[in-house]
Amino acid sequence: EMQLISSIYKLLNDSGNYDNEKIAKIFKEWNNSNLKSYLLDISIKKVLEKIDDKYLIEKIDDLAGDNGTGRWMLNYGIELGCSTSLLSSAMDTRFISNLKGERNKISKIIKQSPKSFDININSLSRAYQFCRIINYIQAFCLINAANSSYNWNISISKALNVWSNGSIIKSSLINLFYSNYSVEKILNDKTIITDLNDFKSDLIDTIAVSLKNDVSIPCFDDALNYFNQISNNSLSTNMIQAQRNYFGSHSIKIN
């Protein structure tokens, strides 16, 4: 969620059409809608915060750290065979941010001219909601896998209740999951799949804008790829199995 908001700020800021005041206004409007969240609220404050009459965010170096919880979750995802692609993308962005010397050198080779481009704010908001939902789906799948592998009995509904009170991920989206979706078996919920499919074109449009204008918005394309894969009954992995089989018997299954 932190990276999603950061990606949105970057896209809006790089468009040349949104200063910090305008970005904060958009975030405030979202925070009075079904996009309301604690993280969005603090992001509004940080976007507007000033020091010596300059916006603080524009003075902060872009080297991002981590306290290890993300790595811990990624390791569990690998151990349990669960996709945590959005978390992985967010962590990769932090790792790449620390290659400051290399980034400075490469940016001088590939010089990018200042540009101005349009962004459909309504599409951006729907793309944001799409990614947030996918992020929760991946978290729910990880919890279910842990329940199965470790004989745990974690109730996702109860976890949502905990997250909705005093957690940094507190948001109106949690209430949406409560009221609209079957959270314990989220991938079997036709309503959430239909809702995601309705938002999909907005996500594609948002990603297209970022690609055309060389703006990296981590997690957005990962959410789209996850949905395209989870909603497709024929993936490219039959070729993977064929390749693995070439190097020895890897128990390929013939339909």
Regions found by a protein language model. Name each.
Residues 197-198, 202-255:
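C-terminal amphipathic alpha-helical interaction region
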Residues 2-217:
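C-terminal substrate-binding/catalytic lobe of Rossmann-fold NAD(P)-dependent dehydrogenases
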